[in-house]
């Protein structure tokens, strides 16, 4: 999934801006994205005090914005992303805002992957078809899902795919 985002950014000659959402699991981590709230260290300092997401979007308004493993982010971070997807602008805690209207936003996730791997018991399909859709539905609020343009499902990598990836990076 990450490689697909890298290929898209190369194809479109746009910078890839990647955020590993596993770094934003705590509630206070939202300040790293949009800046420190009033009264906290870093508020009003500009630069890093404005938030990493806002700074990146200011520097690269036309980019491929990759939010990797979004299911690991805290719910408050998802609320910031909802704001970004709602009107294409994200506002920082110091009033500064940045536009993402010219950015391609990609969220990757492994929601439902573990459940899909479990074999079904009984007759019929041996795969748990539809568990990924159900996992996305259960994890994201309806207003968040309604702002997604599409959901692209990736199949499990087979041995040939893994061999090709290994050769590419060696």
Residue ranges, per PLM feature:
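AAA+ P-loop NTPase nucleotide-binding core of proteostasis motors
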Residues: 1-170
């Amino acid at each position: 999934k990450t490689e697909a985002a890298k290929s898209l950014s190369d194809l479109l000659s746009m910078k890839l801006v990647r955020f590993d959402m596993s770094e934003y699991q705590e509630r206070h981590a939202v300040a790293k994205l949009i800046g420190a709230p009033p009264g906290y260290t870093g508020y009003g300092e500009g630069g890093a005090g404005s938030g990493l997401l806002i700074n990146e979007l200011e520097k690269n308004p036309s980019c491929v914005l990759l939010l990797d493993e979004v299911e690991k982010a805290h719910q408050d971070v998802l609320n910031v992303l909802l704001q970004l997807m709602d009107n294409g602008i994200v506002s920082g805690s110091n009033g500064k805002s940045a536009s993402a209207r010219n950015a391609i936003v990609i969220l990757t996730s492994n929601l439902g992957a573990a459940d899909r791997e479990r074999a079904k018991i009984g007759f019929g399909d041996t795969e748990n078809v539809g568990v990924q859709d159900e996992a996305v539905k259960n994890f994201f609020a309806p207003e968040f899902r309604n702002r997604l343009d599409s959901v692209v499902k990736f199949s499990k990598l087979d041995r040939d795919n893994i061999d090709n990836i290994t050769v590419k990076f060696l």
